[in-house]
């Protein structure tokens, strides 16, 4: 009881309170005997654990975002028409600036090369 009253009478400055929490906010802590940053056992640089389920959910989220982007491209390209998920994936991967071979369904068949030779 005496100790409690003595601690209560001591003034606590904000600096002394902040110094007790410094190690909690820095990335200098050690998890499982190795530093957090660059830890090969599933921790990312922010120090959060990333389990396989979370990685799977993130992959699904990225795939869904890619499909939505492809559907938006379909709507713009085909005047508001919708397309299925597989076509949306292909549309999202199509790059009009890429000169390598891409799926033929994306070429405009009224191009002068096709009209002139019948093939490309």
Curated annotation (Swiss-Prot):
EC numbers for this chain: 3.4.-.-
BP terms from Gene Ontology: proteolysis; viral capsid assembly
Subcellular location field: Host cytoplasm
GO molecular function terms noted in the UniProt entry: peptidase activity
Subunit structure as annotated in this protein's UniProt entry: Component of the procapsid complex composed of 60 copies of the internally located B, 240 copies of the external scaffolding protein D, 60 copies of each of the viral structural proteins F and G proteins, and 12 copies of H.
Similarity comment: Belongs to the microviridae B protein family.
Protein name stated in the entry: Internal scaffolding protein B
Species assigned in the record: Escherichia phage G4
